[in-house]
């Protein structure tokens, strides 16, 4: 029986993906959000899903309401109205926890690499069998007949605790979200609690010291590059400008050679995790091998475009570990080009906590340009950190730029520009694209 769903904060990456999935399953879907453009709304608009401004008139007692986790009575009129009038609603993660019970569910958790790995697993499995999925880049697919459900499992504020999937991958554990987690131990405890809820198989990166301490009632399979101590091992790596080729062994048994058209060592590990999970779940590895070859990536994860013969890469990287992985991927694909990083720090708390790590990561580039820190709606700028504090720690050529003047980026020949951040770094990217386009017009 089709239902009517209203999403409070429908442009959020998880929310938009869920809205698309429910829409494709035959339900009526609408939502509300701020008017500012966000990259997820294109998919919603293409699907014909109505996006409204926040207004208490949007709410109806006959609809099922799903609320974004950031919204509270003091910052959202719809939440305030619902609370005052006894209108029930579920948070995104609460809804998802009950929704997935109708499927064989496969989660992807981890401090970094969740979205790319969820996208890869969704791509392969949906080409093998009918599958519904939710990816953190705002992409969702729903099928009323699907047996399997693939989803991204987010650790922030322990949102993954309502989830009890049959299978899960955990890519890594790292200290992030310092506005919520107090320490690496706190992060570990959250992941360990989640791991205890997996029922059939847990796949963890075996070269992560924290993940080696994880416990679960489900069988734990380790994957990695090193033969000793890992169940699924990637070896014989060949990294080229067209992607990566590698061989996978399971406890000494050769599972064959695989190719992915994506870049960076981290993507080889993501693929090894996907191979391990699907092999253990009983899927034909020849089909897995075939469909890995066609996985082109997910939105805002090493997304490339060429403007006026200039290569521009857009990536969501906003943590030092992610920056290193993204720059490594850029060097693999463009070994003869200068790698120029354009980075916008995301949240003041993260910038303070990881300032030295950010500098170390950005020094992997040949030149670095910094945008002003993008503050989260959850925090207040007390003036404790400025982007210049990060700039002072970078030893490569560097400069702070504004969105109104990105012309310093033109000081490079034969360069690849890697724009990274989780805030509005894309406005800097678009400004640079307009500048490049105008150069072409002026020449003509």
From Swiss-Prot:
Keywords, alphabetical: ATP-binding, Cell cycle, Cell division, Cell shape, Cell wall biogenesis/degradation, Cytoplasm, Ligase, Nucleotide-binding, Peptidoglycan synthesis
PANTHER family: UDP-N-ACETYLMURAMATE--L-ALANINE LIGASE, UDP-N-ACETYLMURAMATE--L-ALANINE LIGASE-RELATED
Full protein name: UDP-N-acetylmuramate--L-alanine ligase
The protein's Enzyme Commission number: 6.3.2.8
Functional note: Cell wall formation.
Organism: Streptococcus pneumoniae (strain Hungary19A-6)
Superkingdom of this protein's organism: Bacteria
Pfam families: Mur_ligase (PF01225), Mur_ligase_C (PF02875), Mur_ligase_M (PF08245)
Subcellular localization, as worded in the UniProt entry: Cytoplasm
Gene Ontology molecular function: ATP binding; UDP-N-acetylmuramate-L-alanine ligase activity
Catalysed reactions, semicolon-separated: UDP-N-acetyl-alpha-D-muramate + L-alanine + ATP = UDP-N-acetyl-alpha-D-muramoyl-L-alanine + ADP + phosphate + H(+)
Catalytic class of the enzyme: ligase
UniProt GO cellular component terms: cytoplasm
Swiss-Prot/TrEMBL GO biological process terms: cell division; cell wall organization; peptidoglycan biosynthetic process; regulation of cell shape
Pathway: Cell wall biogenesis; peptidoglycan biosynthesis
């Amino acid at each position: 029986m089709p239902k009517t769903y209203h999403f409070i904060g429908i442009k959020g990456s998880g929310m938009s993906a869920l809205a698309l999935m429910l829409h494709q399953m035959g339900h009526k879907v609408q939502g509300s959000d701020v008017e500012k453009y966000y990259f997820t709304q294109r998919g919603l608009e293409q699907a014909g899903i109505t996006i409204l401004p926040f207004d208490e008139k949007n709410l109806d007692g006959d609809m099922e309401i799903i609320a974004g986790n950031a919204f509270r009575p003091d910052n959202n009129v719809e939440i305030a109205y619902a609370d005052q009038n006894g209108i029930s609603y579920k948070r995104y993660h609460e809804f998802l926890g009950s929704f997935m019970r109708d499927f064989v569910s496969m989660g992807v958790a981890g401090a970094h690499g969740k979205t790319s790995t969820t996208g890869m697993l969704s791509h392969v499995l949906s080409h093998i069998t009918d599958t519904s999925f939710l990816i953190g880049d705002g992409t969702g697919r729903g099928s009323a007949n699907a047996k399997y459900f693939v989803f991204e499992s987010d650790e922030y504020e322990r949102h993954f605790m309502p989830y009890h999937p049959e299978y899960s991958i955990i890519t890594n554990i790292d200290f992030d979200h310092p506005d919520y987690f107090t320490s690496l131990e706190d992060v570990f405890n959250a992941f360990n609690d989640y791991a205890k809820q997996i029922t059939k198989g847990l796949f963890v990166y075996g070269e992560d010291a924290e993940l080696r301490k994880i416990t679960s009632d489900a069988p734990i399979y380790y994957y990695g590059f090193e033969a000793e101590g890992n169940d699924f091992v990637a070896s014989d790596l060949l990294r080229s400008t067209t992607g990566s080729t590698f061989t996978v062994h399971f406890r000494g048994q050769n599972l064959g050679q695989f190719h992915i058209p994506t870049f960076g060592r981290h993507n080889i590990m993501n693929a090894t995790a996907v191979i391990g999970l699907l092999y253990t779940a009983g899927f034909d590895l020849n089909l897995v091998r075939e469909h890995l070859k066609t996985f082109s990536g997910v939105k805002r994860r090493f997304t490339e475009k060429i403007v006026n013969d200039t290569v521009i890469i857009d990536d969501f990287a906003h943590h030092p570990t992610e920056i290193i992985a993204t720059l490594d991927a850029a060097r693999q694909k463009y070994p003869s080009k200068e790698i120029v990083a354009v980075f916008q720090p995301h949240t003041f708390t993260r910038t303070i906590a990881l300032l030295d790590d950010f500098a170390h990561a950005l020094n992997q580039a040949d030149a670095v340009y910094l945008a002003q820190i993008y503050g989260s709606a959850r925090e207040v700028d007390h003036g404790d950190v400025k982007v210049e504090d990060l700039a002072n720690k970078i030893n490569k050529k560097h400069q702070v730029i504004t969105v109104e003047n990105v012309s310093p980026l033109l000081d490079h020949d034969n360069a690849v520009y890697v724009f990274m951040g989780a805030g509005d770094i894309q406005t800097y990217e678009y400004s640079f694209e307009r500048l490049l386009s105008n150069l072409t017009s002026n020449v003509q």
